[in-house]
Swiss-Prot record:
Homodimer. The active site is at residues 72, 150, 174. It catalyses: 1,8-diazacyclotetradecane-2,9-dione + H2O = N-(6-aminohexanoyl)-6-aminohexanoate. One of its GO terms (biological process) is nylon catabolic process. This is 6-aminohexanoate-cyclic-dimer hydrolase.
Length: 493
């Protein structure tokens, strides 16, 4: 019997099962053993579903029959399983979801087996994953560093080979930021590409800024996953343009010479871009130029304007207030100040001051900003390449605000922290465009640095083709985190 290396991607694992080289039971048990050995050190999987996975593995059919995956404990739910959104009161209630999200249904139909649920900051409101409800998730590359957020559990889990792929969602960079600092591939698709439904706690997907996303260690896995989970479902607020063919079918094709803009400085000027982050983006740009693309220093002028953040943050306040309200409805009692973290309750208090007319004005401003961003692509550019984050990976605890911090002045307060994590990601949540973070760079202290590529609305096909080109030109698969060094082998089935 052949042994499986759990560092192999989902496509390779599925082929081993399909060919009979390994059984789905052997694959699952090896994965469970690895999670049990490694997860106590990083705290990525907070709700293990091993017995459920064993039952589902026996019944799994489809192209990925028996391959495990992990689900972020936020918005997208799985029937019968604990659902908390990392809210203390929800965790204490023991609430279990009464349905499967469309995402979960589609993953099961493709044969994927749900292994567990992974950590997130409370309701996804932080760019580091350190909720009071479950504790901090630690970076497999350095246990003293953050995994980013809000899909930090997903990024850490895929980086540590706890599963080959994972679900995430992204309202300001919450897939791309963890992908960058954990050294994996993270895709935020076009708005409406993946259904978040049937929603139970969110309000209009944060005015369209929140998108379901995907984590993997290879571009081909991202393409295959997107084929599995894409598509409009009843009740979805937004709908992405239909792809002309499966993404996995087209990623190996040469897209021809494309016009690619590069941004390696902060156009707002309120902080300096970390030189190693800038260097990683320049390295990727040079690789694209060597592949025949027309690469130039160019970017949307709108990226030099961050005034939209005030309106965006107001919308976030209202979305969180509504999420707290609806979670209370799920457990049969209102959630109170004692049930949530102090920052979440401050958001509720601010949301209570927002009128309907003021909220509508904020949405209008985001739509206006989105148009300004998108017009750059309309002018003939195909892709934008830039750092995913603009700073080095923070330490655990560095980004958590002390209780009592004046959140009214949070734009200024976040300049040295959270804003530097999301400054280059949140504009594309507002515009709804597809964006991917690739683990191209490494810092001088051994931490991954992601490079972000952004395509025009609906053009994941082009995005993935170029991502695959970069994966071939600047391969990252041989780099493994310190947690998985040779002295500590990944269990084989």
């Amino acid at each position: 019997m052949s042994k499986v290396d759990l560092w192999q991607d989902a496509t390779a694992q599925a082929e081993l099962v399909r060919s009979g080289e390994i059984s789905r039971t052997e694959l699952l048990e090896a994965t469970i053993a690895h999670v049990q050995a490694v997860n106590p050190e990083i705290n990525a999987v907070i709700i293990p579903l091993f017995e459920k996975a064993r039952r589902e593995s026996e019944l799994a059919s489809g192209p990925f029959a028996g391959v495990p995956y992990l689900l972020k404990d936020l918005t997208v739910v799985s029937q019968g399983d604990i659902n908390t959104s990392s809210i203390k009161g929800m965790k204490e209630s023991g609430y279990r979801a009464d349905h499967d999200a469309y995402f979960v249904q589609r993953m099961r139909a493709a044969g994927f087996v749900l292994l567990g649920k992974v950590n997130t900051p409370e309701m996804g409101t932080q760019v580091t994953t350190e909720p009071e409800a479950w504790g901090a998730t630690r970076n497999p590359w350095n246990l003293g560093r953050s995994v980013g957020g809000s899909s930090g559990g997903s990024g850490a889990a895929v980086a540590a080979a706890l599963s080959p792929v994972a679900h995430g969602n992204d309202a300001a960079g919450s897939v791309r930021i963890p992908a960058s600092v954990c050294g994996v591939v993270g895709l935020k698709p076009t708005r409406g590409r993946i259904s978040p439904g049937p929603l139970v706690t969110d309000s209009d997907n944060v005015a369209g800024a929140a998108h379901e996303g995907l984590f993997a260690r290879s571009v081909r896995d991202i393409a295959a996953l997107l084929d599995v989970v894409s598509g409009h479902r009843p009740g979805d607020t937004f709908c992405a343009p239909t792809a002309s063919r499966p993404y996995a079918q087209g990623i190996s094709e040469n897209p021809g010479s494309l016009r690619v803009g590069v941004l390696t400085h902060n156009p707002v000027g309120d902080f300096a871009l970390d030189p190693e982050c800038a260097a990683a983006a320049r390295g990727a740009a040079a690789a694209l130029a060597a592949l025949g693309h027309d690469v130039n220093d160019a970017y949307p002028e709108a990226l030099g304007d961050r005034s939209f953040l005030k309106d965006y943050l107001t919308i976030c306040d209202v979305a969180i207030a509504r999420e707290i309200e609806r979670n209370g409805e799920l457990i049969g009692r209102p959630l109170t100040e004692d049930d949530v973290e102090w920052t979440s309750w401050e958001m509720v208090k601010r949301a209570d001051q927002v009128t309907g007319r003021a909220f509508a004005a904020c949405v209008d401003e985001l739509r206006y900003y989105a148009g300004k961003v998108e017009r750059w692509w309309e002018a003939g550019w195909d892709l934008l390449i830039l750092p995913t984050v603009t700073r080095q990976t923070p330490e655990i605890g560095e980004l958590m605000l002390a209780k009592g911090t004046d959140l009214e002045g949070r734009h200024t307060a976040l300049i040295s922290g959270s804003l530097r994590m999301l400054a280059f990601t949140v504009p594309f949540n507002v515009s709804g465009q597809p964006a991917i973070s690739l683990p191209i760079g490494m810092s001088s202290d051994g931490m991954p640095i992601g490079v972000q590529i952004v395509a025009a609305y609906g053009r994941e096909d082009l995005l993935l083709q170029v991502a695959a080109q970069l994966e071939g030109a600047l391969p990252w698969v041989a780099r493994r985190p310190q947690l998985l060094n040779p002295s500590r082998k990944i269990p084989a089935a």
